[in-house]
Amino acid sequence: MKAPVRVAVTGAAGQIGYALLFRIASGEMLGKDQPVILQLLELPIEKAQAALKGVMMELEDCAFPLLAGMVGTDDAEVAFKDVDIALLVGSRPRGPGMERKDLLLANAEIFTAQGAALNKVAKRDVKVLVVGNPANTNAYIAMKSAPDLDPKNFTAMLRLDHNRALSQLSAKLGKPVAGIEKLAVWGNHSPTMYPDYRFATADGASVGDAINDQEWNASTFIPTVGKRGAAIIEARGLSSAASAANAAIDHIRDWVLGTNGKWVTMGVPSDGSYGIPEGVMFGFPVTTENGKYTIVKDLPIDDFSQKYIDKTLAELEEERSGVAHLLG
């Protein structure tokens, strides 16, 4: 049996955490031969800690063969001690009357502290995925707060947008999602992100040629993917939790186990590709191998695409400048 991998999950008793933990413990994220130790963080509030205890009792009651141990805590340094993987799910949700700016600042405090704790106690090659919104900027803050860790250790989740776009294309084409490749999603995990099927193929044939409808792309596809989260809240009365958990599992599994040359979307610190300033946490098409991701390079960007990329970049730059004073 392999040595267990230590996986930290923050916001562990929340909706996404509840949809996530049982799938990690069953081996869906890292493989059916990989034991895990779950290190679970919740708020230092009696109700949250009680809920966490209940979730841990349920995890015990599943008797997962791969669950080699659990820690539940309200201390980030305990949760992140020696972790190989950290899923930062917990974040401050937007309350009534809260401006986006207030939300940014409330979360900046959380992710500054979590970045510093990871910097202090996590494994040096820890893989960090930020799920809590605003995910790109929260990931940027955590990265900047962990100066001793490689910036490449930090990623933001755009896989939910990627999966949403895949499913819309599948429905439009009447083809299974498994056959659709080379989809890209650019930018921020927000309604400004740009799902781009110009390079995509379905069963080897060009998706763009098959759809051949720029009006559908601009007025149906892009806004449907961008506003899908809001549509789910409208329908369910709660935000998308199971699909977000599923995307987090996809993201980590592909990062750790590799994509075999297939493109996926990850929010990663830019290396200057496509004119995105270095260090901006931006959604790019990537491939992964041996636990490392590589941005897909040299794709032609047409005027239509550039306009969307500029817009989502402007939003990220604005978020970044809104928290700059906190990062020294």
From Swiss-Prot:
UniProt catalytic activity: (S)-malate + NAD(+) = oxaloacetate + NADH + H(+)
Binding-site list for substrate: R94, R100, N133, R164
Residues that, per the record, bind NAD(+): G11, A12, A13, G14, Q15, I16, G17, N107, Q114, V131, G132, N133
Keywords per UniProt: NAD, Oxidoreductase, Tricarboxylic acid cycle
Active site positions, chain numbering: H189
NAD found in the keyword field: yes
Record has Translocase as a keyword: no
GO biological process: malate metabolic process; tricarboxylic acid cycle
Entries under CDD domains matching the protein: MDH_chloroplast-like
One GO MF term attached to the UniProt entry: L-malate dehydrogenase (NAD+) activity
InterPro entries: L-lactate/malate_DH, Lactate/malate_DH_C, Lactate/malate_DH_N, Lactate_DH/Glyco_Ohase_4_C, Malate_DH_type2, NAD(P)-bd_dom_sf
SUPFAM superfamilies: LDH C-terminal domain-like, NAD(P)-binding Rossmann-fold domains
EC number: 1.1.1.37
Matching HAMAP family: Malate_dehydrog_2
Family, as annotated: Belongs to the LDH/MDH superfamily. MDH type 2 family.
Function: Catalyzes the reversible oxidation of malate to oxaloacetate.
Name the UniProt record assigns to this protein: Malate dehydrogenase
Source organism of this protein record: Xanthomonas euvesicatoria pv. vesicatoria (strain 85-10) (Xanthomonas campestris pv. vesicatoria)
Upper classification of the organism: Bacteria, Pseudomonadati, Pseudomonadota, Gammaproteobacteria, Lysobacterales
